[in-house]
Amino acid sequence: MMFEHVLFLSAYLFSIGIYGLITSRSMVRALMCLELILNSVNINLVTFSDLFDSRQLKGDIFSIFVIAIAAAEAAIGLAIVSSIYRNRKSIRINQSNLLNK
């Protein structure tokens, strides 16, 4: 019973992240939605790891690895957004075409 609830929560968070990623106009909001998607994947990893083999921690360790990669991705993404804001004075996605300056 608990397994279905956790999978529903993960699917719901993933759907919210995809919807926000598609409809967002701000780069910061897009990064937040991407983090939401990665966290829903982490919930799935831990849930299936506990379901199939609770003695081994493969899903938990992989989830920690994904969290570390997501933290690095967020730091680099925010650095890029702040650099674009300093140069363009806007963080809107449709106004930041870097190819035609």
From Swiss-Prot:
Membrane topology per record: Multi-pass membrane protein
GO molecular function: oxidoreductase activity, acting on NAD(P)H, quinone or similar compound as acceptor; quinone binding
Protein localization: Plastid, Chloroplast thylakoid membrane
Catalyzed chemical reaction(s): a plastoquinone + NADH + (n+1) H(+)(in) = a plastoquinol + NAD(+) + n H(+)(out); a plastoquinone + NADPH + (n+1) H(+)(in) = a plastoquinol + NADP(+) + n H(+)(out)
Taxonomy of the source species: Eukaryota, Viridiplantae, Streptophyta, Embryophyta, Tracheophyta
Entries under PANTHER family matching the protein: NADH-UBIQUINONE OXIDOREDUCTASE CHAIN 4L, NADH-UBIQUINONE OXIDOREDUCTASE SUBUNIT ND4L
Pfam assignment, any one: Oxidored_q2
BP terms from Gene Ontology: ATP synthesis coupled electron transport; photosynthesis, light reaction
Known role: NDH shuttles electrons from NAD(P)H:plastoquinone, via FMN and iron-sulfur (Fe-S) centers, to quinones in the photosynthetic chain and possibly in a chloroplast respiratory chain. The immediate electron acceptor for the enzyme in this species is believed to be plastoquinone. Couples the redox reaction to proton translocation, and thus conserves the redox energy in a proton gradient.
Entry superkingdom: Eukaryota
Keyword Thylakoid on entry: yes
Protein's UniProt name: NAD(P)H-quinone oxidoreductase subunit 4L, chloroplastic
This protein's UniProt keywords: Chloroplast, Membrane, NAD, NADP, Plastid, Plastoquinone, Quinone, Thylakoid, Translocase, Transmembrane, Transmembrane helix, Transport
Annotated source species: Lemna minor
Transmembrane feature ranges: 2-22, 32-52, 61-81
Enzyme Commission number(s) of this protein: 7.1.1.-
Self-association and partners: NDH is composed of at least 16 different subunits, 5 of which are encoded in the nucleus.
Annotated GO CC locations: chloroplast thylakoid membrane; NADH dehydrogenase complex
